[in-house]
Structure formats: C-alpha cells, structure tokens
Amino acid sequence: LASSAASDVYKRQGLIFLILYGIRHGNALAVTTFSIFGSSLIVLYLASTLYHAIPNVRAKRALQYVDHSCIFLLIAGTYTPFMLNLMPNWIGITICTACWLIAAFGIIFQPWLMKKSDKLNTCLYLFQGWLVLFAFKPVVEALPFTGLALLVAGGLLYSFGTIFYNWQRLPYHHAVWHLFVLG
C-alpha cells in the first residue's frame, strides 16, 4: 500500500513532464501516447492502492480484478509511446496493436485467469511484456541507447520480480514484488 501511494506523486510529475515535452515540440502524437502511458500508470497504481487498502472481502475481490486488469493496460500503455513515436511503421504499429489485443484478451478473461492460477496470469503478463522480442532488431535500431537500456532494465526488473510475486511461502513476497515494480 505504502509503495503504491508513495510513488503516485512521482508518476504524476512524470506524466506532466512528458506531456509538456510533447507540447513544447509541437508533437500531437507524443502528447497522446505519453498521456496514454501516464494514464495507464496512474490508473494501475490507484487500483493497486485501493485493492491493498480496502479490507472488505467482497470489495477486495472486485478490486483485485481491476488491479490485475490494469497490469495489462500498463504494459500496453508502456509500449504505445515507444512503438508509435519511435517506430511509426508497420512493425511498431503491429507490435502496439498486438499488445493492446493481448490487454483486451487479458481483461476479458481475467475472471477465469484469476480462478485458474496466478502463474497463468503472470505468464500472460510476461508474454505481453516481452512481445518486443518478435521485432528486436528493428526496435534496437529505432530506439536511442538510453531508451533501450531503460526499457530492458524495466522489463528485467518486472520479470525478475515475478519470481517473488509467485513465491507465496516467502514472507512479504508481495512487498518484495512491489519493490521490483517500483525499480
């Protein structure tokens, strides 16, 4: 709870910075895609904060659905500015579209996924997150080194963190997962 709420200020500041950057450069696509990314980030952490803060069991189950669904939105929202601003060709558009289709699939089937297994859900998140590997060479050529390094580092942190998320016998495994996410 504290990790989600505490980082909210930084996410809002980051969103404002990105939107102003797009406005300053007169780039409507950048403003739109940065807004999609920032909004998906804020919505996920708001959902996560509510899910972890509300003790009512019935409300908690509904909020868990929203929380888990918003993870798909954040992954797609993260891909959107990279793919559409830096790769506005068929490859970038295809990867971005595929990412949003996986998000829609994950949200629609979230009730079933939640009943089956957290591991199945995690595998779908990881597949969506590493979708970029299907077009790795063009992505490496299109992204500046810093952007690529940050994207890979973020992907590795999230991916490695899923080990702790699924390690339910480990005390505070969920808190450790959140630390990886904030990284």
Segments predicted by a language model, with ranges:
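Single conserved hydrophobic/aromatic residue that forms the stacking wall/gate
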Residues: 1-6, 10
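Terminal transmembrane helical module of multi-pass membrane proteins
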Residues: 118, 141-183
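Hydrophobic residues within membrane-embedded alpha-helical segments of Major Facilitator Superfamily
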Residues: 17, 36, 43-44, 50-51, ...
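Hydrophobic/aromatic-rich structural module bridging two neighboring secondary-structure elements via a short loop
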Residues: 54-71
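Helix-coil boundary and interhelical linker segments in multi-pass alpha-helical membrane proteins
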Residues: 14-34, 78-95, 134-150
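Membrane-interface helix caps and helix-loop-helix hairpins in membrane proteins
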Residues: 57-61, 83-90, 110-120, 139-145, ...
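Small-residue-rich segments of transmembrane alpha-helices in multi-pass membrane proteins
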Residues: 11-17, 66-80, 122-136, 179-183
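Alpha-helical transmembrane segments in multipass membrane proteins, preferentially the mid-helix core
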Residues: 105-112, 129-142, 159-167
